[in-house]
Amino acid sequence: MFAKVKQLFDESAREVQRLAKLAAQINEWEPTISSLSDEQLRQKTVVFKERLERGETLDDIKIEAFAVVREAARRVLGLRHYDVQLMGGLAMHEGNIAEMQTGEGKTLAATLPSYLHALLGKGVHIITANEYLARRDCEQMGRVFRFLGLTVGLNVSQMTASEKKEAYAADITYGTGTEFGFDYLRDNMVYRLEDKVQRPLYYAIIDEIDSILIDEARTPLIIANKSGIGAELFPIMARIVRTFEEGKEYERSLETKQIFLTEEGAQKIERAFGIDNLYDWEHHVLLHHAMQSLRAWFIMRRDVDYIVKNGKVMIVDPFTGRVMEGRSFSDGLHQAIEAKEGVEITEENDIQATITIQNYFRMYEKLAGMTGSATPSKEEFWQTYRLRVITIPTNQPSRRTDWDDLVYQTYEAKVRKIIDEVKKMNAIGRPVLIGTTSVAQSEQLSAAFSKAGIPHHLLNAKTEEEEARIIATAGQKGQVMIATNMAGRGTDILLGEGVKELGGLHIIGTERHESHRIDMQLRGRAGRQGDPGSSQFIISLDDDLFRLYDQDELKKWKSKVETDETGRIVSPDPIKFVQKVQTTIENAHYSARLHLLKLDTVIDQQSKVIYHMRDRVLALKQAEVLSELLRHIHRHITQTIDRYCPENVFFEEWNIEGLHNELRRAFFRFAYPIDDLRHKQKEEIAQLVWDEYKSLEAALADLPCDEEQTMRLKHLMVETIDAHWIRHLNQLNLLKEGIHLRSYGQEDPYRAFEMDAYREFVALQQAIDAGICTTAMNYLKSQFVIDDEAAAAANKP
């Protein structure tokens, strides 16, 4: 163990030394670069691009290019990159995560690799935690890039397609990860290639990379549309499942938010609906409603995961505590919660396109990031994204003191201690920032502060811009502020006059988060750039963290607890126990993310095949459209003959009527009556069919295909692909829902899902061929002049 830790430490130290040497080389360029005029400095961009065109690489020019950006930032912003920022920029250029502490200037550091990679003209994406930060950084850092002759774009929601296209065409584009991901999905739903807004994904730098790639990775991006499936089942299901008991009718894992029906639970639903087997495919809609109702009642929590306001269920962002206007839970979960809460039930949505954040960002040719808290997830970053974490030293030695946790037996005892601490700090004018894990907890604590007569600010339900503005004042003398842990992230808290002498900003964490990294981020709000500061977590066994832990083990540990007169746990060691609980839950979340990634990777691979198929059709030239149509018809006919004339069945038993009907749909004028197909071998039937195919081929070759008809046929093909793909996606979703059942039969559930998904995908491709064939033939009927009587006679059954 110690050997491994020492090895990691040595590797990190070697990396830091290597980067420090490169930073020293950049410093050597400073006198030369600083002597240039503004115009000469701008001209460097042209020179660098010419050198790259002549075959030099980014590594060949990086030292000089970084020196140019540093000088431009000094002239435009009045900010000169510290050596540690140069090191962070170099780490990101190499495709790593630069772990830089809060207040160390990550945003400025990102200008260095962004500029360097933008010189290739492929587009650089800078991903921020929210739209406010995207706008802010685009405006502030964009001044440096524009000064150097590069273009800068902003990609946020509510923009038109043409505005987005312009933003993506820029050398450097700022935006949120979800918006980039949704644009990718929307691009694969367009009906003209020129309507796509994204270029091929080249290089992305992700700010707060752990929040975006890990904490938010459990929620897939989904574009959905109204399904037309009635919502009347949800209230009925709510009346059934509300009486269920854990361990009896259902089992759940609060750490991973998974829930399973027991045999007894399934039987209760079967009795209620008068069916034999809930898991039969004919009852898949019922099973879907049952599982979502279970999640609504026993996983999702009011005022934590969602709120009910004006008769509407509204999602709460788990990281900021902010209500997400206009968003709804997908796949029927929203409707199940509405039934639970007794409000009007909205229409359920069908999934039209989906991707996880993980798989979206893995499509970039090169990825990098920055955060103050990557080390605890070092292994996951490497396993999932092949990203190394490099810890960059601080510019000034840290003067923040992190006190040991105080752990109390009850919530009430914890709040009393928090109030005492705040009063003590407030008496000397020292500012205090109190971090909570949810809006509901913030409000509870605020009420307790008001009762205790403590003046304070409650940072809830604010816009991102207001949050940033208010949290920036948290370091002022006498300030007391309550906020969710992630509120106003990305905003520096500057100390007011005289606050350094009082000890700086003091942070109080009121609960340990499910992730140690978010606790680190809260602590990191104090003691920026060598300022004094301190932090302490004051928590209790009533906190949500312990609700997620094994309750039997928790009870066992509680039975040994000894407290002092204030209710603080003194024995057994509470800090060790808290670390154990947090690690267990973090591991469970890691497993859940791996679970999602394994399943989604199967769907992602299939998505890419379908998206490629769509693009192929949309890219067809006028002369190629009919050939593409014939390709689908040819495949459909081959599959039809094989399906109705199987080798392992006697020809007397073949479904000739079914075959004839299918061929009539494939050829709008199939020349042979049904009796011509009876009592024939497969080869003879195939010969008749392929003769007919050749006639169709010749007829299509004579067909005039103008631009309008070309466009219509392309649209028909793509509409058919989309319709079948949407059904397939929803089918895969149902398969995912029942995956836990496979493990009961000693099957590997992931392998089983992979095999089932593959079989469904083969069926999907066959359905697409059949659909394109039928739809196109129906459309083209009017284009042919045929002998109606002859056609009618041939097509009689």
UniProtKB/Swiss-Prot annotation:
First-listed, main subcellular location of the protein, grouped into a coarse class: membrane
Superkingdom of origin: Bacteria
Entry keyword annotation includes Membrane: yes
Lipid bilayer topology: Peripheral membrane protein
Pfam families: P-loop_SecA, SecA_DEAD, SecA_PP_bind, SecA_SW
SMART domains: SecA_DEAD, SecA_PP_bind
Enzyme Commission identifier(s): 7.4.2.8
InterPro entries xref list: Helicase_ATP-bd, Helicase_C-like, P-loop_NTPase, SecA, SecA2_Bac_anthr, SecA_CS, SecA_DEAD, SecA_motor_DEAD
Family the entry assigns: Belongs to the SecA family.
Annotated HAMAP family: SecA
Protein name per its UniProtKB record: Protein translocase subunit SecA 2
Organism: Geobacillus kaustophilus (strain HTA426)
Name of the gene encoding the protein in the UniProt record: secA2
